[in-house]
Amino acid sequence: MTQVAKKILVTCALPYANGSIHLGHMLEHIQADVWVRYQRMRGHEVNFICADDAHGTPIMLKAQQLGITPEQMIGEMSQEHQTDFAGFNISYDNYHSTHSDENRELSELIYTRLKENGFIKNRTISQLYDPEKGMFLPDRFVKGTCPKCKSADQYGDNCEVCGATYSPTELIEPKSVVSGATPVMRDSEHFFFDLPSFSEMLQAWTRSGALQEQVANKMQEWFESGLQQWDISRDAPYFGFEIPNAPGKYFYVWLDAPIGYMGSFKNLCDKRGDTTSFDEYWKKDSDAELYHFIGKDIVYFHSLFWPAMLEGSHFRKPTNLFVHGYVTVNGAKMSKSRGTFIKASTWLKHFDADSLRYYYTAKLSSRIDDIDLNLEDFVQRVNADIVNKVVNLASRNAGFINKRFDGVLAAELADPQLYKTFTDAAAVIGEAWESREFGKAIREIMALADVANRYVDEQAPWVVAKQEGRDADLQAICSMGINLFRVLMTYLKPVLPTLSERVEAFLNSELNWDAIEQPLLGHKVNTFKALYNRIDMKQVEALVEASKEEVKAAAAPVTGPLADFPIQETITFDDFAKIDLRVALIENAEFVDGSDKLLRLTLDLGGEKRNVFSGIRSAYPDPQALIGRQTVMVANLAPRKMRFGVSEGMVMAAGPGGKDIFLLSPDDGAKPGQQVK
C-alpha cells in the first residue's frame, strides 16, 4: 500500500574541494543514496543534494602551490567529484559549491539576522601567528596535543580522538603546519557566535528522541562540560566570503559550509523555476523533513552550531542527523603504503559500483559503528549473494522460458502461498530500509533467496524438461522462479541500480515496490542475457597495486610555475622603483656566431638604439620573425661586456627556459620608449 507522500530533503556532508573522493567518502554517499532510492520507491517527494565545501586556507595554499587560482582548482575538483559520484550512481538532484552566489547571500542573511538578534559578539583575541610565513594560522594549520584527552598530533579546531572542539590557542605545544615554526601570539579582533544562549533549546532538541542514542549521549557530555562561544571569523589572507562591514575579516569555513546545504537547494529551486519550495522546506514551521547524513567526526558542528545558527536566524532545524562510523580496510585504517587508501575512480577501473554498494549496505546499521571492507570477504560475499543466490535464480529459469515458451510466463502461480510469503516480507524489509538497518534488510532478502533456490532445487525444472507431457509444469515452475526473482530484485533495487536496470530490461517490466502484489502472469519477458559477472581476487590484487602506484605518483614533487620557481623575498616599493622598464621595438634580430643560445637584438627606444644579447635562440629559431615586434626591456641595467660584444639591457620574457621562453609584449598602441609602470 502506498504511504502518505512526504516532502523530504536529504543531504550528505560536503566533500572538501582539495582532494579526491575515496572509499571512506563513499560509505556515506552510498548509505544516503540507498535510503533516498527507497523513499522514492515508496512515492515520497525527495530532494537529494550535496555540494563541494570550497573555502578555507588549505584550498588557498594548495592553489598557490599548483600555480592556479582557487576558483580554477575548486572548479576542476567539482567536476572530478561529480564524475565519481555519478560513477557510483549516487542519485543527486543537485550538486553545487559553497563558493556560489546563493551561499554568499544566505551566509550574509544568517549572519545579519544573528547579529541583529544579539548573537554575534566582538572581541579582541590573541591568535597564533606564523612568524616565518607572516600569516595568522587557521585552526587546521596548527597541530599539537589535545587539551582535553592529551592525544598528540591533533588539529587546532577539534580532536579526532575524543571529538572535542577548542581554540587553537588551547593546544599544548602547538606547531605551524605550514612552516613547522612555533607560532607566536598576536592580537586580532574576531567575531563570535553566542552558542551558550541556545543551550536550553539544544538540550530539548537532544531529548526529543529523534537523535541516535550515541549522538544524544555525546551531546549530553558537551552540555555538562559547558558550551563556549564559537569563533566564526578569520583574518585575511583567506579564501571565502568577506564578512559584511568588516574589511579583511572572513567567515570561518564552518559557518558557510552547512549553509551550503541551503545554497545547493536554493540553486536547485532556481534551476526548476520553483519560487516556493525553498521557503516551504526551510521556514521555521516547515512540515517537510530534513535529514543530514554525516560522519561521526563532524557531529559537534551539526548537532550544536548548525541547529543553533538556524534557530537564531529563524530557519527550521534538521529533523534528524544520521551519523555513521569510519571505513577500515582489511581490519586497519586505510593505508597508502599498503594500497588500501583507494580512490573512488580507481575502484571503478577494477570493479563495478554495485559491488561496493552491496557490500557496504550489507554491513550498515543505524548505529555509529565503523565498517570494515575486508577485500577477501568482499569477493566471497558478492559472488555468493549477488551471483549465486540472486542472479543465478533468474538464469536457472529464464533459459527454459525463452527456449520452450517463447518468453511467455505461465498464466497462474505454481505456489501462491510461497509467493505471498515473499510479498508479505515487504513490511519487515521496508521497515529495515526506513530505519537504516540495512544489514538486517539484506539478511532478510538473502534468506528469501535461499528459499527461492530451494524451491527450484526441489522442483528440478531440468528434470521436468526431459519428461514428455510436462510442458505446463515446466512453464509454471520456471515462471514461479522468475516471479520470486522479481520480488527479490524489487527489494534490492535501492542498492543495485545498474543490475536493476538490466533486470527490468529482461523482465520487460519496471521494478516497483507496490507492484509486487501482482505477479507477472501471461507476461512476455525478453531474451535472457548475463546479468552479472563473478569477481575474483586477481581484481583485488590489481586494485591494490594500482592504488600503490597512484600514491607513488602523487608523492612526486609538485610541479607548476610557483612550485618550480617560488616567489622571491619581498621587496619594498622603493626597490621596485629603481627598475626602469621600457617599451622597445625589435628593429633587427640575428644569430650570434659562436653561440647556440644567443640572439643579437637591435632595439629602438624611440630615439635611442640599444644592442642586447638574449638567450632566447631555442625558443625563436627564426630571428627574422621577431623583427617589427614590440617587447619590454630593462633599460637601466648596467651594460655587460661579453665576448661577442656589449649587451646594453635585458628583454623581459616568461617561462622556465629552453624552448619554453615567451617574450613579453605590450598591448597595441604602446610606443617605443614608453615607461612600463
Curated annotation (Swiss-Prot):
E.C. number(s) listed in UniProt: 6.1.1.10
Catalyzed chemical reaction(s): tRNA(Met) + L-methionine + ATP = L-methionyl-tRNA(Met) + AMP + diphosphate
Subcellular location: Cytoplasm
CDD domains found in the cross-reference section: Anticodon_Ia_Met (cd07957), MetRS_core (cd00814), tRNA_bind_EcMetRS_like (cd02800)
tRNA-binding domain span: 575-677
Motif position, 'KMSKS' region: 333-337
Cellular component per GO, a single term: cytosol
Principal subcellular localization: cytoplasm
Family membership: Belongs to the class-I aminoacyl-tRNA synthetase family. MetG type 1 subfamily.
Protein name as catalogued: Methionine--tRNA ligase
Organism: Salmonella paratyphi B (strain ATCC BAA-1250 / SPB7)
Organism taxonomic ancestry: Bacteria, Pseudomonadati, Pseudomonadota, Gammaproteobacteria, Enterobacterales
